[in-house]
Amino acid sequence: MKENKIIIGSHVEFKAPDYLFGAAKTSYNNKANAMMIYLGAPQNSKRVNVSKYKIEEYKRDFEKIIVPENIIVHAPYITNCANPDKFDFATDFLIEEIRRMSFFGAKYLVLHPGAFTTFSKEIAYEILEKALIKILDQTENVVIALETMSGKGTEIGTKINELTNLIEKIKSPRLALCLDTCHVWDAGYDIKNLEVFINHLEEIDALKYIKVIHLNDSKNDIFSKKDRHENIGKGFIGFETLQKIVFHEKFKNIPIILETPWVENIPIYDKEIKLLLGQ
């Protein structure tokens, strides 16, 4: 039987010269056992060859502490899989991104569901469905975790049941949910009433699909649709609720990733992880 444990880390930089090795070293120094990276700048499609990732150095020093399945890769923002005009670019790019992930064994790709422009939300979901099927058909192993969104602009994915319905329609074990605490709060879910929220997740059959958690406080009150992350305990969600999520039995063995703001141009993930763990 799998041991129940807390898996926690943060977004860390994946950059020259050390790439994967450097990201793992930063996470290790933060006392983390998970991490999230972008394989390039979130705003563009430029990627370095996987030969530069320093995979062997990562395996030598950190693989037993930050195991590959707890390395989360976030898809870049430029891939809008719900836009028919960007369909080929988005799907082809993500197929290659998943293949890059396979070189070091990362298990989860977090993906924003997308947004609609000159077309309807219903069409956006239809395009997203086709995109996911294409990507899944041409890749192996990696699980795509659709992120819950705040409702900013014309984003889709703000209603958790809509994402769950899409997953159940496609019927692939390689589809999951990434629950972002700031986003669901900003979208109108009162996660401060945590047990009520968890019961709702169970009622809509969503809880079983949550495989990644983004743990962020929010700069705005509930249902603001703003998507502005705040440091742990400094926002409207509050420390108590966020710590409850970390220790909750329903979320054990799920990688919990912090994406909170830097303070005076310095990341404070080490302090926030320590605070959340009560150390």
From Swiss-Prot:
Catalyzed reactions per annotation: Endonucleolytic cleavage to 5'-phosphooligonucleotide end-products
Co-factor note (free text): Binds 3 Zn(2+) ions.
Chain positions recorded as Zn(2+) 2 binding sites: E147, D180, H214, E259
Enzyme Commission numbers on file: 3.1.21.2
GO biological process: base-excision repair
Cofactor: Zn(2+)
UniProt keyword annotation of Ubl conjugation present: no
InterPro entries named among the record's database cross-references: AP_endonuc_2, AP_endonuc_F2_Zn_BS, Xyl_isomerase-like_sf, Xyl_isomerase-like_TIM-brl
Residues that hold Zn(2+) 3 according to the record: H183, D227, H229
UniProtKB keywords: DNA damage, DNA repair, Endonuclease, Hydrolase, Metal-binding, Nuclease, Zinc
Residues involved in Zn(2+) 1 binding: H74, H112, E147
Enzyme class: hydrolase
GO molecular function terms noted in the UniProt entry: deoxyribonuclease IV (phage-T4-induced) activity; DNA binding; DNA-(apurinic or apyrimidinic site) endonuclease activity; phosphoric diester hydrolase activity; zinc ion binding
Protein family according to the UniProt entry: Belongs to the AP endonuclease 2 family.
NCBIfam families listed in its UniProt record: nfo (TIGR00587), PRK01060.1-1 (NF002196)
PANTHER family: APURINIC-APYRIMIDINIC ENDONUCLEASE (PTHR21445:SF0), ENDONUCLEASE IV ENDODEOXYRIBONUCLEASE IV (PTHR21445)
Protein role: Endonuclease IV plays a role in DNA repair. It cleaves phosphodiester bonds at apurinic or apyrimidinic (AP) sites, generating a 3'-hydroxyl group and a 5'-terminal sugar phosphate.
Name the UniProt record assigns to this protein: Probable endonuclease 4
Gene that specifies this protein: nfo
